[in-house]
Amino acid sequence: MFLLYSIMNTYFLFGTTDWATLNFLVSVCLDNDYLYNKNSLFFTFFIFFLAAVFKLGLPPFFFFKIEVYKGLPLFVTFFYSVFFFFNYLSGFFFLFFVFFTSFFVYFSYLLFFFVPVFVLFFFFYLTTYDNLNCFFSISSVINSTFLVYLLASSFF
């Protein structure tokens, strides 16, 4: 819902969802016009970033487990989840840094806030082998789905 909201809000505000066009519109002075206010666009991108965090399954936003991967060894779930996780994350950061240079300062503020929270919760949550295996398995399912969406969006 957050992703749908952010995409629809961006389209209704600017009439486009093209990343390069949005970066150009933000780089010019848009503070005078009410419809093209930078604050509403920053809020939309914050919602988009939060939705990406939810969909990635980063802690502390997942408290559920998948029972399918219980029988697999830890190495299999680790490799599968890390491969898709870094593919999605590198694609997202590449698109963000190439097309959204106007948002670099705000994005670094978000990372400065979210990364320590994720790291602390990661170490508190992963105290047992069972939780570690479930962590990698749930991340792999979510990230593999988003990798397909990311590749589809780059081709179409």
UniProtKB/Swiss-Prot annotation:
Which domain of life, per UniProt? Answer: Eukaryota
Among its keywords, does the record have Mitochondrion? Answer: yes
**Keyword annotations for this protein?**
Mitochondrion
Q: Where is this protein found?
A: Mitochondrion
One GO cellular component term of this record is: mitochondrion
Under which name does UniProt file this protein? Uncharacterized mitochondrial protein ORF4
Q: Which organism is it from?
A: Paramecium tetraurelia
